[in-house]
């Protein structure tokens, strides 16, 4: 598994590529100001970019570049308050897929001076004409380590491996052993391991993800056995944790353990830190609060988010009866620089408050709904495993389409997918159908409190 990674949004990557390759065949430069994700894995996140103007460079040619130190000083001013990391990025217009001797000497001269100003990790990086980025990181004693993976998160997902940077940029073909091999190097996180979540997790395990992190605080109950994979009556009788049960069974699929159970409410520091260790995030929950946390994790840690939900609304019939109105599923793909689940109306401040009130005092919530003070939360009809499987499959297929493109149309047309089985309809909404509000949490990383929520501050009780 990659121990050191660098992530940036597709929007920032496009901005950098346009600046670094203006069309004159000469090198260009920028400074990346990076936060990092909390936890044991070193995941650096590009938060700010200081582009060095071409006309301010002292020298620019096809193989070398000299630029004023004032742009590093500007980056230090941004990095110093949070002790962030700086990565000095430049282009190789000729496509040389290695750090040159000139690059090596430059790092040895400049990076020690940056350490004197701030931070404990800094580095350098190169972008090639095809957009591929490779990077390396230094510690204060100038010990160097390669960045194993550079990931770009947008409508499409790009994973650039340090050991394959000289190869063609084309992605592995979907549904092949090459896809399986790459998945074996990635980590997925599933929030919610119940009806849809257990089916999503099962697919991720069978597809070959190198590590699968499961987050859920609930125990197995008898009523769950008709829809949660890998559970038994014995598990319910002993009220075992859902994540522990699933991990125990799924870890038998391979010679080594790769499924990591995290028995915790998603609104805890333990759960949020665990989610931040992943490369891709799946949200399979039935509460709005949990979805709001997944939304924040996506933004703060620059993770692609796949959210799935199902519902079976009913309608009144004559004689006070009820009938199935629809059996429906929804899959939303959210990337950090795009519209959030909040922007798309999946949850609002009002129904988050209503849900919190319902958890704290169901009677007061019912009374307020009757008085019309707040919007009621629609009661979810019981799920069935066939509907869950349909939705969970669509969710994982959405990930495959983003990471290993096979669609005839652009992925931007599929920000949301809805299927209505009673009507026999599947609908898609494009990204431009939703307004993306600016987020103060974008690439926030480990800034305290985590996700901007005091409850997730260091030292808070889990």
Where are these regions (language model features)?
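Internal hydrophobic alpha-helix adjacent to the cofactor/substrate pocket in enzyme cavities
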Residues: 389-408
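S-adenosyl-L-methionine
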Residues: 253-269
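Conserved beta-strand-loop surface patch within small alpha/beta domains used
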Residues: 1-87, 93-157
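E1/E1-like adenylate-forming module used to activate ubiquitin-like modifiers
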Residues: 267, 272, 277-390, 407, ...
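Glycine-rich adenosine-cofactor-binding loop
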Residues: 176-219
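Glycine-rich phosphate-binding loop and adjoining beta1-alpha1-beta2 segment
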Residues: 214-254
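N-terminal charged helix/coil linker that caps or initiates catalytic domains
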Residues: 140-188, 414, 454-458
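A short helix->loop->beta-strand "cap" motif at the edges of active sites that frequently abuts
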Residues: 120-122, 255-257, 301-303
